[in-house]
A protein has these predicted regions:
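Non-catalytic cap/lid and distal C-terminal segments of serine-dependent acyl enzymes
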Residues: 1-211
Length: 211
């Protein structure tokens, strides 16, 4: 990261000197070089952190589709992880997907009336397998920093790649990961409290599973 910063400042500084001292096309070329130096440094730094995976993510956009949760198993139909692994070892579970999925979900704010953005949920292969009885899986809840969003949690954190890697060596098993939104917007610093400025973020967090 520091090398990108140093290189960017060095090239931009060199170009700015030529903008001041040069004339005509040399000045134009130096101005263009300044822009490219700053842009290249910014891209290099972002590659190190993985904060913005796409151009759209700069503007809060993402490519995730709405989740279809109608086919998820009900609590009474769940089996233990040990039972699942035994069935997987016996070959009685078929069509376990190679990868999990990441989709948008709505977490109702019935009690808090907090204007949250859509959350993201990662479902591991075991939750998507062609099996009537799915395993009971742990749920990991993640929140972004500020500025931030559920999408940036998944992109910058490489959540799907990490979880899929774990699932590949554990019969499709991995935690369900939910990135909820406690901010409402990148520019809002709710401090996870109820306030007149940004709404009832604390109440939303306390009741996120029930609305």
């Amino acid at each position: 990261v520091m090398s990108w910063v140093a290189a960017g400042f060095a090239i931009a500084g060199f170009a700015i000197v030529h903008i001041v001292l040069s004339r005509g096309m040399m000045r134009v070329a130096a101005a263009i070089l300044t822009v490219f130096a700053i842009l290249a440094a910014a891209i290099g730094i972002d590659q190190s952190y993985g904060e913005y995976a796409t151009i759209g993510s700069l503007f809060g956009e993402d490519s995730y589709s709405q989740a279809d949760l109608t086919g998820l198993a009900k609590r009474k139909d769940l089996i233990t992880v040990a039972q699942w692994r035994k069935q997987a070892a016996n070959g009685t579970i078929r069509n376990i997907p190679a990868n999990g999925t990441v989709n948008k979900i709505d977490i109702p704010a019935t009690k808090s009336q907090f204007e949250a953005r859509k959350a993201l949920v990662y479902l591991p292969p075991a939750a998507l397998a062609d099996s009537k009885r799915k395993p009971a899986l742990p749920v990991v809840l993640m929140l972004s920093g500020q500025p931030g969003s559920p999408g940036r949690v998944f992109q910058a954190g490489g959540i799907q790649t990490m979880m899929d890697g774990y699932a590949k060596t554990h019969d499709g098993l991995a935690p369900i990961v939910i990135a909820a939104d406690q901010l409402g917007a990148d520019s809002h610093n709710t401090l996870c409290v109820d306030s007149k400025v940004y709404g009832n973020a604390l109440t939303y967090r306390r009741t996120w599973s029930t609305g």
